Amino acid sequence: MKNTFKILSLLLSFALLAIACTEKIDDGGVTDGGDQMSFLISLPEAVSGAAGDIVSVKFYSGKGPKEGDSVVLKKGSSECECEIVAITANNFSFRISPQVSTGKYTFSIKRGAQIKTIGEVNFTIEKRVEIVEKEGYNVYGLISCDGVGVPGVVVSDGVEVTTTDKDGLYYLKSDEYNRLVFMSVPSGYETITDTCIPKFHKVLDGNSKTTERADWQLTKVDNKDHVMYLLGDMHLANRTNDASQFATFLADIKEQIKANKSKRQYALTLGDMTWDLYWYDNVYDLSVYVDMMKKKLTGLQIFHTIGNHDHDMKEVGDFNTVTLYKKVVAPTYSSFNIGDVHYVVLDDILCENTGTGGSGRKYKSTLTTDQLSWLKKDLSYVDKSKTLVITMHAQMYNEGGSASLSNASELASLCSGYKTHVMSAHTHVICNNDLSASNGIMHHNSGAICCTWWWTGYYVPELNICKDGSPAGYYVYQMNGTDVKWRFKPTGRDFNYAFRTYDRNKIVMTAANFAPNASSTGVTNFEKSASSWSASSKDNYVYINVFDYDKSWKIEVTENGKSLTPELVSIKDPLHLVTYEAKRYNAGSTPTSDFKARTVTSHIFRVKASSASSTLEISVTDRFGNVSTESMKRPREFSINEYKK
């Protein structure tokens, strides 16, 4: 077989269209009549594929086609009908008719004698190279670059793993349980991108008795040295002014994209891009998130990790909760290669919910045996000289360094021999565990873009902080070959904003001072939570919250030239107490238990000064030699306005 092929790219961009039931429904002016046809459809603006391909379309609020309906495509005087092959609660799929040619078509739904026009779709019809099917293999395809097949590309259905042959062809024996197939994008290439969403997986029909073809086209790039942005919890839900606050993050990361324009750049989320509680109430699910990101953040590919709030908790169990995610975002677990780094995305959220929402929203943090089995196969194709980056939503290890993931030891065993970085989020705190000496793993828990579900920024726009006191932000990883360097980037602040200081002598945290309108119950609860900071003090302690601290960092404090010794303490961050809990109690509300200030913050230090009015010189140096300093003039007031500066 020749190894030169021509295939066209697949582009899908969505525009939400609301169609009123009283409008004209086609150029002939036929009206709905007695059987009303009302649609709320997210229509593809462009579709590229071949005759017989299945195209999936999303609809909202149950306003989609019914059984027996069909799709009618009209271009000029030419008209054809496409079969609707499947309808679910919020999606329908149709098969591209052999009569469709490249061009713009009017897209309508036909029901009996009635037709409702939805909008227009641009079709690009591919002329695919014929591939000889192999008996016993039901999923197959071609991966090429500039018309030439790319050999050695890893392809999987989440269970079976194979590679392309010398002509870029692959064949899989798939039970199609996961209803998808994906490739592990090879080093030195990029896959087609739908604005900012890399297209490296295809949804299958789930019928292992039929054959299905999935092709990908790659572009050759130099990405050995690259930048990866790690993005923790976003919790976008159309509430608490989150869109406006998220715009601040978007502006910030766009500045970083400009600053790093000499390198290839990518982003990787760490889960909870959305908030399942508001998928239906606020009409903000994953498809809305994807549509927003495609409009608001371009110039880099964004890979994704699934979080617990990215599952549809109205479904029962685990498998059906991720149907929408797999359709519009990505597989729940997969891998890809950029330069000398092998990235693995895992799903460590196993849902056990009843499908009723509310108290039925149950899950545990673990990796399924299917994932671990797949990962073992995937890593068999990855040389030990490569750097391994694994992302998951919930932590592998907790702040004390003990296992948080139920099968952390099994995962660590699979990573043996690799220099491994594990990135997580979930808890909305920053925590680093360097376990490289024992098992080769550096574990990073990465804070949150939304901090405290956007509440602190809602109450005090200049102080959007997490429950450990760390500011809203994200990570910038510089990947140079196998070498990895990183810095935490506070949203709207300079990189050098690496710590925050508190003068204990000036803190008297009472409800009267910070929540004067709280109820009696609110007063009691707040003062119990803030008890470590409620009493006045003259002990001259200064507290330093070093946000991205790990044990390789150096903290130096001097008073009048004399060194003071920092000690790590277990205490709640005082600024989070007054920007979240106090504000909630003051408004007559109850703080969410998950976001009350933590009992243990793993990166607060204190020093004891000799005077209440001395100036302290503070220098913090990270593991890569980046230095942040502050000349702390005391006494320093403790107030919200003081820290808004």
Say what each PLM segment does.
Residues 87-94, 574-606:
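Aromatic sugar-binding surface patches on proteins
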Residues 177-193:
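A short, solvent-exposed beta-strand micro-motif common in secreted/extracellular proteins
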Residues 156-174:
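Short, acidic Ser/Thr/Gly-rich low-complexity loop/linker segments typical of extracellular
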Residues 13-46, 122-134:
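Bacterial Sec-dependent N-terminal signal peptides
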Residues 191, 198-208, 279-376, 380-382, ...:
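Extended active-site neighborhood of metal-dependent phosphoesterases/phosphodiesterases
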Residues 131-138, 145-146, 189-281, 645:
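N-terminal active-site segment of His-dependent metallophosphoesterases
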Residues 441-548, 553-556, 602-608, 615-631:
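Binuclear metal-dependent phosphoesterase catalytic core
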Residues 66-69, 137-140, 145-159:
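Short, ordered, surface-exposed loop/turn motifs in non-cytosolic proteins
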